């Protein structure tokens, strides 16, 4: 039982077979996306049952040609026309305002403590830490390739593990600068609420604030060629002390 619980907890930050919901949130923006999704689902469920009830009532009560009120209320009802015009408009407004607010907040890039440059290639990712230097006084940079299934360690995730992970400190404002070296790619990490297109010759940026330690998996989300599925993204969030140790090892 303990093994199963630990296995489930580990897989919450990665795609799982037959998954029907989001991965566990690890950033404020992903928590906001979860909340927005749940709120919209509430409206959709209410609409589904309301429309279903109305249709069923019409079929049962007004389909008969003997009904003296069917034409009066269904073909010439000003009140009902106002209701089915105003009600959807109000619902759309209730959905739109939280959506616009979240969209604006996700587009804002707070004053970052550090930046990471992510560059997509066919078919791997390159990363650079422009705020830190290695032992040769060069920017810390490395390439990240998928680990073949034959080389996976025990417990490794197929098509998701890489040879070099992006290591970030938790509780730190980080800016990802995203670009591409050949064709269009997309940098996506669902648990972090990140999805940003990578264009050759153009820099896009997205802010992330990881609020817990963990290993978070993502993939290129733009079809970029025959090995598009072989461009996983692995971001490891560690404590600041562990991050400083990792920097010294580079």
Curated annotation (Swiss-Prot):
Protein's UniProt keywords contain Transmembrane: yes
Gene Ontology molecular function: any one: copper ion binding
Gene (UniProt): COII
Protein name in UniProt: Cytochrome c oxidase subunit 2
Residues that span the membrane, as ranges: 40-60, 82-104
Residues that coordinate or bind Cu cation A1: 185, 220, 224, 231
One of the Pfam families matching this protein, by short name: COX2_TM
Task of the protein: Component of the cytochrome c oxidase, the last enzyme in the mitochondrial electron transport chain which drives oxidative phosphorylation. The respiratory chain contains 3 multisubunit complexes succinate dehydrogenase (complex II, CII), ubiquinol-cytochrome c oxidoreductase (cytochrome b-c1 complex, complex III, CIII) and cytochrome c oxidase (complex IV, CIV), that cooperate to transfer electrons derived from NADH and succinate to molecular oxygen, creating an electrochemical gradient over the inner membrane that drives transmembrane transport and the ATP synthase.
GO CC terms, sorted: mitochondrial inner membrane
Assembly and binders: Component of the cytochrome c oxidase (complex IV, CIV), a multisubunit enzyme composed of a catalytic core of 3 subunits and several supernumerary subunits. The complex exists as a monomer or a dimer and forms supercomplexes (SCs) in the inner mitochondrial membrane with ubiquinol-cytochrome c oxidoreductase (cytochrome b-c1 complex, complex III, CIII).
């Amino acid at each position: 039982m303990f093994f199963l619980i630990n296995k489930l907890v580990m897989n919450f930050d990665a795609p799982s077979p037959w998954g029907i919901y989001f991965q566990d949130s690890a950033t404020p923006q992903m928590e906001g996306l979860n909340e927005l999704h749940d709120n919209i689902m509430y409206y959709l469920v209410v609409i589904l049952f309301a429309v279903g009830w109305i249709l069923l009532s019409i079929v049962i009560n007004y389909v008969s040609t003997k009904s003296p009120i069917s034409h009066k209320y269904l073909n010439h009802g000003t009140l009902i026309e106002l209701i089915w015009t105003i009600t959807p408009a109000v619902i759309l407004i209730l959905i739109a305002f939280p959506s616009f607010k979240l969209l604006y907040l996700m587009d804002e890039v707070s004053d970052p403590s550090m930046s990471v440059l992510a560059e997509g290639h066919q078919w791997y990712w390159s990363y650079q830490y422009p705020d830190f230097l290695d032992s040769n006084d060069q920017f810390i940079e490395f390439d990240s390739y998928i680990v073949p299934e034959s080389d996976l360690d025990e417990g490794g995730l197929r098509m998701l593990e890489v040879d070099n992970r992006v290591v970030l400190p938790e509780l730190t404002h980080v800016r990802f600068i995203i670009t591409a070296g050949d064709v269009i790619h997309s940098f996506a990490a669902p648990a972090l609420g990140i999805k940003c297109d990578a264009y050759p010759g153009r820099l896009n940026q997205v802010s992330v604030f990881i609020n817990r330690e963990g290993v978070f998996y993502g993939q290129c989300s733009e079809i970029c060629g025959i090995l598009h599925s072989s461009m996983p993204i692995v971001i490891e969030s560690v404590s600041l002390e562990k991050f400083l140790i990792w920097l010294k090892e580079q």
